[in-house]
Design a protein with these regions (language model features):
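A noncatalytic interaction/capping subdomain that flanks phosphate/NTP-handling catalytic cores
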Residues: 1-107, 120-126, 131-187
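Conserved glycine(s) of the Walker
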Residues: 109-111
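Post-Walker A alpha-helix
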Residues: 114-115
Length: 187
């Protein structure tokens, strides 16, 4: 697999020779447009991974595990996006009536579960796993990932990438059983 993605002001070549990682990589980068020229790269091979962001090659010897690859790609994207007005974070964003709610939490804390439950209350999922936020004057969602992990299943949601102002931030510790709770958000 070989694809080039336009991320902010950089073009990232992603090259992978491990077929079982292709879907993860494509899903992880689905929020970005593809292009044809690159100025930085990540090359994932059976016995080593090489990446270059700021003119220096970094080499990781050995085959990356699925979970390590997920983190590495997120860190590379963060390195490209993060500056004084932009941040790329592990989060979700839901929206109703042009009011966005940023949901923060650790891996497997229940962000996707909360997103699914919010649909019942009329919310729309704008970002399922990673969010590119812009905070020039107010906090806005610039782009959101379409990759939704829920109950050990993975799917691509039809997330919109429209800018949405974030009106509230919700930090989640863990969601164990949503059948005993009613989803309600006060205005």
């Amino acid at each position: 697999m070989k694809k080039i993605y336009s991320i902010k002001d950089r073009n990232l070549l992603v090259e992978c020779s491990i077929n079982e990682y292709d879907e993860l990589i494509i899903n992880r980068l689905s929020m970005f447009e593809q292009t044809d020229k690159y100025d930085c790269y990540i090359k994932i091979k059976q016995n080593k991974t090489i990446f270059r962001i700021n003119s220096v090659d970094q080499i990781i010897n050995g085959q990356l595990k699925h979970t390590d690859l997920y983190q590495l790609i997120n860190n590379i994207i963060s390195n490209i996006i993060n500056d004084s007005e932009n941040v790329y974070i592990h989060s979700a964003v839901i929206e109703k009536n042009n009011k966005g709610i940023l949901i923060l939490g650790d891996f497997n804390s229940g962000k996707s579960t909360l997103c699914i439950e919010s649909l019942k209350a009329g919310y729309q999922i704008l970002s399922a796993d990673q969010s590119w936020l812009n905070y020039k004057n107010n906090l806005f969602l610039k782009k959101g990932s379409k990759y939704l992990a829920y109950k050990n299943n993975f799917e691509i949601i039809d997330a919109c990438n429209e800018k949405c102002e974030i009106k509230a931030i919700f930090i989640i510790k863990a969601v164990f059983d949503t059948s005993n709770y009613e989803f309600y958000i006060e205005n």
